Every structure is written in C-alpha cells, then in structure tokens.
Amino acid sequence: MENFPTEYFLNTSVRLLEYIRYRDSNYTREERIENLHYAYNKAAHHFAQPRQQQMLKVDPKRLQASLQTIVGMVVYSWAKVSKECMADLSIHYTYTLVLDDSSDDPHPAMLNYFDDLQAGREQSHPWWALVNEHFPNVLRHFGPFCSLNLIRSTMDFFEGCWIEQYNFGGFPGSDDYPQFLRRMNGLGHCVGASLWPKDLFDERKNFLEITTAVAQMENWMVWVNDLMSFYKEFDDERDQISLVKNFVTCHEITLDEALEKLTQETLHSSKQMVAVFADKDPQVMDTIECFMHGYVTWHLCDARYRLHEIYEKVKDQDTEDAKKFCKFFEQAANVGAVAPSEWAYPQVAQLANVRAKDDMKEAHKPILSSIELVE
C-alpha cells in the first residue's frame, strides 16, 4: 500500500489505546464463543427466511460476511446485555451494514414514505419494510426514551446512506459538511442508546447518565471507527467518501492535516468519555468501559479492517510505537481472535436452501379432501 502513513497510524492507535486504558477482560474464551454462536445462529435463521432472501437481494457471500462482522461487533462490545438482546441487535445492525454497502437509488421507493407511515401501510422500500418488521424485537429490550433514540438514529442512518449514493465529499469551504454527514450515517445515537436495556437499567433513574452517554458515544464510536478503518479505506475505491477525505475537500487541507484533525478529536473524546463517567454510577461506567474495550478488540481482530497486515508489517521493527502497537494487537488477539468456523455455522445460504427445499416439498404434497380426512 503506497504512501500509507504507517508510523503516524501506529502512534495514533497507541495513544488511543493508552488513553482508554485498553484491557479487554469482557469474557472467557468459552463465554465469547457461546455468545457469538447464539447471536449468529438466531440472526442467520432470520436472514435465511424466504422473505428476507427475496427482498434484500444481497449476494450470499456478502450477506454472510456482513452478518459475521456485525455479530462480532455486537457480542464483543455489548458485553453486558442478554444473549437475546445481542441477537436482536445483531439482526438490526446487519440490516444497516447491508444498506451501507448498497448502491440502489432510494428515491423512487421513498416517494410515499410518510403517507405509508401515517396510514400504517408497509413501506415501498424493501429495506424499510424488513427493518420495521424486526424493530419490535429490538425495542422490546428498551424503555421508551432509548427506543426513540434507536428509531430516530436509524432514520438518520438511512438518510446518510442516501447522501453517500452521490459520492459527494462536500464543497470546499463547507466546514460543517463532513461532521454533518458522519453524524448522520454513524448510528452514534442508536449505539449509545442500545447499551441500556431495561432489564439492567431504569432509564428514568439513570436518565442523565444515559443522555450524556448517547451524546458522548455519538462522536467517540464513529471517530474510533474512522481511525481504525483508515488503513482499509486508504486505497479502496468504494471508501473514498470518508470523514478524513471529506475534511481534505471541505477544509482544503492535506491528508496528513485531516488525519491529525481526526486524531486530536478522537483522543479528546476518549479523555472525555473516561473522565465524565469516572465518578458516576459504577454500573454505567462499567458498561461504557466494556463497550470501549470490546469495540477496539473487534476492530483489531475482525478481518474486515485488515489490521493484521499492519501487525505483520511492523512486528520486527524496533520503534517504541511499533512495539506498543504489536503488544496491544497481541493482547486483543489473545481474547478476540476466534475463527468463524468455531461459531458462524451453519451458513445463511445453507439454511436458505434447506428452507427452499422444505417449501418445495410442502407445495407438492397431495391435498386431501374433507371426506378423505374423515375416512
């Protein structure tokens, strides 16, 4: 990968991990695999249904990869919620990743969005129809305030993906545009609100902490994602509308300056996240800390982000940042590097084929008359 600023990336990653005092102890290996398989199995059966297969029209390999990535994110990061909640969130966030990777123009299917919403009709856009059907399974885990955040943030995400269809990085001088788009498609409020299921938290009692967590998480989780994604997106044609690249266009600065801007904002947000909740409800702080550490582990271990390539490149270097990065990477791999073959089975395509064959058999069964049934 030509011209990638490896040394800068190492220094930034190390500072981030030091700021949050990274030490992922969320699970034993057995617990991690158990939760991964539970969430995956339920989600895989969901997406293997004929309706989902027909309406999503996603390449089976891409759907499989998306599901595995999202299950990893949810299980690693939402370490305090129930397995059932993990599974339902995995389905919801897989839908969002499928939309994020889509290139379909949403305009025609959105012409009657509000009229259909008001009348209680099924949405014309297939993604909305499926997401709305699943939403009750997600919202049952949360109180009304957190639920409203999940709904609103999901709508924002759809709009952000719509904007990204135009591959528009903003006009030069439009300084607000990069952060506007990143907040829109970052799902920060959805993530921030989904950490507080009602079986663990009374949202009225913890209202101030939850509200603050939603506010802080909006930037922290998307900025960390942007930093950890920077390597995989650096020369990928599909990922040229990123926050860093949009900083370059709108602020009319160099790539190095844009990366430094993101770095400083991410580090400041990390400091805030730790400092603000340090003296608050211990259960709240524990939930946030587990999320932060699990979220980092997921990025370091998931193949989507290709950070093992950085590790292999620098593991024999003698610089302080290289040694620290490798130590953090190995620490993450020790707890989070679990082969999909240990938990991501059966494949969605296999389940879908079994369902299709069963439906064919059912369709070819002889129909008995009422007389034959009596006889």
UniProtKB/Swiss-Prot annotation:
TS is a member of the terpene cyclase group of enzymes. It catalyzes the isomerization and cyclization of farnesyl pyro-phosphate to form trichodiene, the first cyclic intermediate in the biosynthetic pathway for trichothecenes. It serves to branch trichothecene biosynthesis from the isoprenoid pathway. It catalyses: (2E,6E)-farnesyl diphosphate = trichodiene + diphosphate. Trichothecenes are sesquiterpenoid toxins that act by inhibiting protein biosynthesis. Pathway: Sesquiterpene biosynthesis; trichothecene biosynthesis. The lineage of its organism: Eukaryota, Fungi, Dikarya, Ascomycota, Pezizomycotina. GO terms for molecular function: trichodiene synthase activity. GO terms for biological process: sesquiterpenoid biosynthetic process. It comes from the Eukaryota. This is Trichodiene synthase.
